[in-house]
A protein has these predicted regions:
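Phosphate-binding site of ATP-dependent enzymes
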Residues: 112-197
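Rossmann-like NAD(P)H-binding beta-loop-alpha module
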Residues: 84-107
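Protein kinase-like catalytic core scaffold
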Residues: 107, 158, 202, 215-218
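Short glycine-rich anion-binding loops that position phosphate/pyrophosphate groups of nucleotides
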Residues: 38-40, 113-114, 222
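Conserved N-proximal alpha/beta basic substrate-recognition cap immediately N-terminal to
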Residues: 1-86
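A long amphipathic alpha-helix within ATP-dependent nucleotide-binding catalytic cores
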Residues: 168-216, 224, 228-230, 234-249
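A short linear hydrophobic-aromatic micro-motif
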Residues: 86, 106-109, 135-137, 201-204
Length: 249
């Protein structure tokens, strides 16, 4: 869809297949490369890192790598002052248990490198964790929905509300989504998270707080735009064209 928007503008582009690229023998320099649909594996990261030396890759490999790790994402969000649930990352079940006892007798386990809501569950005792360490756990924030905010160039441009009968509300986990307006406090939370990561565009997942405002669950560096009514492909195409023009000045 983004490619179709570029075609409408008469913007020339070429597809780059990372499965068959040798970055040391590729005559590509001074270009804008949109890393769409990237698989989060070491080979593609290394290819893009090599290409970044002579080109502008969007999103950057550093940003994508940060978003792939819940630990690094959370560390940057907390350091920036953006809202985040209380979090524990440790090899020790004893420390996990102390965290649970301090945060209402339950917590949420999440795989460090998980995606689409896979492998996430609530537990009440550290002994319930079956996975090997390290353990990444967060306080449980009572909710019946979450929000995915699409951010481009540090501006919230689209949002959906996701709901399900389960702990996670991801569309891939059976959740349903509908487009919603973006109030200022929602935009502020999403935009501050994007700035904390330093990412061109992203999907920021937020939970509403009973006391008001929102907290940042995670930042997705390769987001889709399921259920969005905002013209995300058009806005992304506009951003890519703008960045390319700025890079060529």
């Amino acid at each position: 869809m983004v490619m179709a928007e570029l075609q409408k503008r008469g913007v020339p582009y070429a597809k780059l297949d990372l499965a068959s690229v040798d970055p040391f023998n590729l005559p590509v320099s001074g270009e804008t490369i949109w890393a769409c649909g990237i698989k989060q594996d070491g080979v593609q990261f290394e290819l893009l890192k090599a290409l970044e030396l002579e080109n502008h890759v969007i999103n950057s490999t550093d940003a994508i790598a940060t978003c792939a790790s819940k630990v690094t994402t959370t560390a940057k969000i907390i350091r920036s002052g953006a809202p985040s649930p209380a979090t524990c990352f440790t090899n020790s079940k004893e420390i996990v248990q102390k965290f649970i006892d301090t945060h209402g007798g339950k917590a949420v386990y999440k795989p460090v490198y998980g995606f689409d809501g896979n492998g996430i569950y609530m537990f009440h005792s550290a002994d319930e964790i079956k996975e090997e360490p390290p353990y990444y756990v967060q306080e449980y924030v009572k909710n019946d929905r979450d929000f995915r905010i699409f951010v481009i160039d540090y501006e919230a441009v689209g949002a959906i509300k996701r709901q399900s009968a389960h702990l996670t509300h991801n569309i891939h986990q059976g959740g349903t989504g509908c487009a919603v307006e973006i109030p200022k406090d929602m935009a502020d939370a999403a935009e501050s998270a994007a700035r904390a990561i330093g990412i061109d565009y992203c999907g920021v997942d937020l939970l509403p707080l009973e006391t008001g405002g929102y907290t940042v669950l995670e930042v997705n560096g390769t987001p889709n735009w399921h259920c969005m009514t905002a013209p995300i492909p058009k806005l992304l195409a506009d951003y890519l064209v703008k960045q390319d023009k700025e890079d060529r000045r």
